[in-house]
Structure formats: C-alpha cells, structure tokens
Amino acid sequence: MKKTLTAGVAVIMLAAFPAAAQTYNLTLSGASPGGLWSRIGGGIDAAIAKAYPGSTVTYQTSSGGLANIPLVSRGKVPMGLATDGELNAAVKGAKPFKKAIDNVRILFRVYTPASRFQQSFFAVTKSFADKHGIKSFGDIVSKKLPIRIAINRRGNMDADVGEAAMTLLGASRANIKSWGGQVVHAASKEIVSLVSDRRLDVVNFGISFNHPRVREIAKNVSPVLLSYGQNVASKVADQFGGEVCAVKPGEYKWTPNGAKSVCIGAVIVANANMDTKLAYNITKAMVEQIETFKNKSHRLIKKTATSKVLSQKGNAPHHPGAIKYYKEKGLM
C-alpha cells in the first residue's frame, strides 16, 4: 500500500511538472544578406519558433547553393538553401562539382519553378533592335551582329543557364567573338547599370518576374523581350533541373512580346544522417505553421506557399523524416 501511494504521488508530481518542451537551435546557410533568400530564412525561423517556443534558426550568409550543398554534405550546417539547378548539378557530379554528392536530402520546398522567382530574363534594347531590324534572337544569329551581351557572374549557375541557351540558339561565346561582339559577366545590379548606360545590347540573366531591376531596365532602354523558344527552353530546363515557363504576350506592359523561358525553384536540404525525428519535426513545423512562414517571409512567398508546395519533389530524395510526415498528412 505504501509503495502504491508513493508511486501515485510520483505520478501527480510528474503531471505537475511536465517535461520541458522541445527547443531547437539550428543554422540555415543561405546567400548574401538581404533579398529573397534572407527573407525566406526569417520566415523559417518564425515558423520553427512558433511551433517550438524558444527555438531559433540562424541565417548564415554564404555565396549560395553551390556552397551550401557541400556544407550540408560535410555536416558543417544542418540545413542549406539550394536552387533546383544547383542540387541537380550536385547529385549528378556536374560542373562545378568534381564528383556526385549523394548524402543530401530535401526537407521541404520553398518555391516552385512555376512561381517565377528565378526566370531567365532575355531582352534586347529597342535602339539596337530598331537599328538592325531584330524581331527575334534568330535575327541576331543570322545577321551575325556584334552584340554586347551580359550574363550572370562566373561561378553563378545562372551564368551557365544563360550560356547554354545562347549556344543552343547559335550564339556560342566563340561565335559572338567572331562577329565582333562581347560576352560580359556581371551581377544583376551591374547589368542594369551597364544596359542603362548603353554599354550592353542584350541581357540574359535569371531574376524574378517583374522584379524592380527588370522595371528599371524597361524604363531606361525600352527593351524588346526575346524568347528561347520551346525546344531550346526544354533542353536547358532538362540540363539544369528546371522547368519551361512563359511570359504571356502583353504580360509585361512595355512589350507586346511573349516568351518561352526557363524557371528554377529552390529547396531546403539536410544531410541524409539528420535525425529522423528532427527532420520530421522541422517538416511538421513548416506545414502546421505555414501562415507564420508566409507572413514573416518575402511578400512573393505569401502568394505562392502552400502545404502542397512544401512537399513537392526536387532533384534529390526527400529525407525519410520528411516523407513520414508528408505521408501522414496525405501530401505525398
């Protein structure tokens, strides 16, 4: 009787003093401070903190997904942001990776290619188009015009996307040089400055649809939108793990042209060795606190994020912990 009473008192005491709630202190490797990815990091931090009070997700700056995937693979950070193209290259061991990385897994997707957060923007200045009678990029190739064309910085996969498209369209780097033209590597901000100063004729770089920098280019040089075409866009999308996407005719108010382009999405990756319960709980938090994620993230995320988007497949397998939660909720 005494033992039973003692046990009963112990149960009452445990009920009065419940176990401390689970908290997490995690790091997410992203890109430069400011911009879309850092805002996404803020949204993830808010969602995890709402689900597990006292938890934090620290956003660590880096040079982007090409750096984040190896960091996650080597266990230097628990989570990293990466585009579909970067993850595709990593798992295949394609340039710039020297060998395949097979120990990274997807936890959840932050945006799809269809949301057009990274869409190839391909345009020629109106003055150059009018001078040479350009209606399509094929006119530039057939006339072998000495274009000054800008793509993204070296080491940025977006530059590889742009160059691959140009080559398939008949404007390889060697061809452009033989026509008396020039290929310029620059970040998007510098591209805007160069084209506004009339030091570029054509631009070809990835950026979100109707981004302020696109609007600035439109204001300064009245560009004519160019298209990759369905065939080239499909080949480039397959090569870089993206999707063919479109700009509808008239969707940009400054040009009547529509265009076929390539869009790239982005995911959060973790090491395959991440504890299954941790992966499950992170995924659970993101789905159950999706409104917090949307409200504390970038305004564009607020328009596109859904539970189904979070569970959408990517270019590496999902982590087993994430799969377990998605299947429980009928999302996979």
Regions found by a protein language model. Give the residues of each.
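C-terminal lobe and pocket-closing loops
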Residues: V224-N281, P317-H318, Y325, K329
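Sec/Tat signal peptide C-region and signal peptidase I cleavage site
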Residues: F17-A21
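Bacterial N-terminal signal peptides that target proteins for export
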Residues: M1-G8
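Pocket-flanking alpha-helical
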Residues: G42-A46, T58-N103, K189-V195, L200-V203, ...
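An extracytoplasmic/periplasmic, membrane-proximal ligand-sensing/linker region
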Residues: L169, D197, V202, I207-N220, ...
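Bilobed "Venus flytrap"/periplasmic-binding protein-like clamshell domains
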Residues: N25-A51, S55-Y59, F117-S120, V124-D197, ...
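Bacterial N-terminal signal peptides
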Residues: G8-A16
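A structural signal for short loop-to-beta-strand junctions that line the ligand-binding cleft
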Residues: A100-F121, E251-K260
